[in-house]
Amino acid sequence: MKRTFQPSTIKRARTHGFRARMATKNGRQVLSRRRAKGRKRLTV
């Protein structure tokens, strides 16, 4: 049986990366929440 997690750095960055977050209004909200919480890393 094929495993569900097939890691790919490019796909990871394109879906969860900084530019992907900045592209939408909700993504920017995610970043602001993470900044407010004091996360060391905002995105992957």
Swiss-Prot record:
GO terms for molecular function: structural constituent of ribosome. Residues 31-44 have a biased composition (Basic residues). One of its GO terms (cellular component) is ribosome. InterPro entries: Ribosomal_bL34, Ribosomal_bL34_CS. It comes from the Bacteria. GO terms for biological process: translation. Keywords: Ribonucleoprotein, Ribosomal protein. The keyword Transport does not apply. Residues 24-44 are annotated as: Disordered. HAMAP family: Ribosomal_bL34. Belongs to the bacterial ribosomal protein bL34 family. This is Large ribosomal subunit protein bL34. The lineage of its organism: Bacteria, Pseudomonadati, Pseudomonadota, Gammaproteobacteria, Pseudomonadales. The gene is rpmH.
